[in-house]
């Protein structure tokens, strides 16, 4: 949902939009809670409070002040990510398609012939990093840029087996127009750009697990972050390949040689980072034109020193000349060298050309070896061709996508490679490598071992759920790692499936109850965003590839109502109850009936079950931003601090009742996942609370009334306000609690309206208005370690007779309390108090 704050109402009516007028009788937190549970996507918030907007944003719900009709129109028609700390909005708005336009934030693409393969009459526009060049389009009170681009389509095409780009583009645009927006993927770059600077500023040692190409620019500014990926393809791995011949396959209709060179250099930079943890100088031989340097400099400041007879417009220092073996001593330490020298073929015969290429390969290798043999902190990426060749067995082989699969590939070498064993590799094996293997990631660091690292902060986004990891090892890592942000695939199946298919692999699934954590928050993507200064206008869908975000060692753990809080906890319930259910009271009715409480009079105001816990369980797929386990735990240890809102402290038994209702709901819905989740949450409640039951009671608390509007034949009709199991020396403690509660007890508005047979030969009258007081009394006794209440549901009633009687109904009648007393069962009254 998105909340657009206005000072004045608007005349125009928008679809899926609701107006909320700030309620001055309630505080900012209560207003935020009410807004968060509205069911439309767009909320126009009138007479708004800035504090309420802040509360919503910290909860991950985008809430923005809107000052003009243009701002309102821009925000209501699309989704966006909001940097609420810096007041920047990143639109995810593809309406530019109506300009016959596709967009890119990679400059090199604009220098290709891609324009020849677009849809007829369409153009390509460069919009800069995260669309920052579009800021001039929006003259708004907040900074605004459109981060939507078609780079995802272009990159997917490059790695696909399809050649016809126009058909591919058309199909993908049609898919985009007919499917829901993948908001998490679109906002992820904004999130990473907020996340990693904040972590690096706090923690000296940061580990990042499983980065992919979409993060290749993000980490250029963080050479000290230790990356873990799937490892490199090295020369000794070629032993498994059978020899093949030249293939000559076209990969892309437009020229992607620039992309290949950029990937080679970025791969080399990250390889260098992992060895030396600092930024290198970047030397490039055969560099022209290297338009992609502009892309890298948009993200991070590097020194590029280049050699080529042709211009390299974006390099820092360019030598418009050839580079020779004798020039190697010009290259400094703390650097990487990219050798991409290749003479143009022109009209040369292919056999003669082949000799030239092979000689250049030897020359390139000689330059690489000479560069690495002296000095320190050096890495080289060198262009090679398929030929009979000796290479170090530890050399890293690269084959990033290029326009045509021909004979070229690349190798990354370091100082250790040149002194290790070399192996002779025949030309046919290199062709097998080129023909069959595409390097899909610029991160070629070794795989991460699933072990906790006490001094490091571990980030693992979408990286550990794959079933080639041990599920238990993943759980152990999360349980033991003190400081981390780790995601795992959420189990949102209905059959409680332990693993689910994702693309061509399987992922393990997890529920919050799989982990045993303290000082940790388990939330959704939106809930996590709120903790890092961002909010989002579109929540994750309840089904599909969703993840739990687990933040260990956060200073926000005790800020229960600020982060990963209960905002939106009833939203799905409202959507169902006020649309397709039998009555808007359906949730209340079901919760009471499923706990054998058949008195439904006033069920919507006097319910016997925690609605928070019930909704958090049965609709967890919709509201898992709320960290239920944390909420339960902080209540159990009495460490709940709230800034505002209507706060009601649940008795632990209310939480148990909620789990029982949720389990019955799950059985009726055939939802095995909710069934297990509710069972495990009930087990967790019993673990963190020390709940004892007076199932064999010896005392009870009774309420005597001035008069009863029914006929009765018992000596003194009374309401049993609860039973206890105590020793005689605890009577004083019980009396102390009753005295503390005296005012509230006598203010309880108890009423009755019918009689019924509680069981055979037990004729009773109902008593409404009791439960709230009962649960408060329960909490008082619980905190004083006094066993109060039974394991079965407390059903307030007044016993009238121990024989079968005809039931009657009357107008609801208020009962005046005469006295409240503590009495031993089958014994004497030990305490009595009147108002």
Swiss-Prot record:
Give the catalytic activity. Answer: a 5'-end diphospho-ribonucleoside in mRNA + GTP + H(+) = a 5'-end (5'-triphosphoguanosine)-ribonucleoside in mRNA + diphosphate; a 5'-end (5'-triphosphoguanosine)-ribonucleoside in mRNA + S-adenosyl-L-methionine = a 5'-end (N(7)-methyl 5'-triphosphoguanosine)-ribonucleoside in mRNA + S-adenosyl-L-homocysteine; 5'-triphosphoadenylyl-(2'->5')-adenylyl-(2'->5')-adenosine + 2 H2O = 2 AMP + ATP + 2 H(+)
GO BP terms: namely:
defense response to virus; symbiont-mediated suppression of host innate immune response; viral process
In this chain, the stretch annotated as 2'-O-methyltransferase activity covers: 246-428
Q: What is its EC number?
A: 3.1.4.-, 2.7.7.50, 2.1.1.56
Active site positions: 718 (for 2'-5'-phosphodiesterase activity), 720 (for 2'-5'-phosphodiesterase activity), 797 (for 2'-5'-phosphodiesterase activity), 799 (for 2'-5'-phosphodiesterase activity)
Which UniProt keyword terms apply here?
GTP-binding, Host-virus interaction, Hydrolase, Inhibition of host innate immune response by virus, Methyltransferase, mRNA capping, mRNA processing, Multifunctional enzyme, Nucleotide-binding, Nucleotidyltransferase, RNA-binding, S-adenosyl-L-methionine, Transferase, Viral immunoevasion, Virion
Q: What do we know about how this protein assembles, alone or with others?
A: Interacts with VP1. Interacts with VP2.
This one is known as Protein VP3
Q: Which organism is it from?
A: Rotavirus A (strain RVA/Human/United States/P/1974/G3P1A[8]) (RV-A)
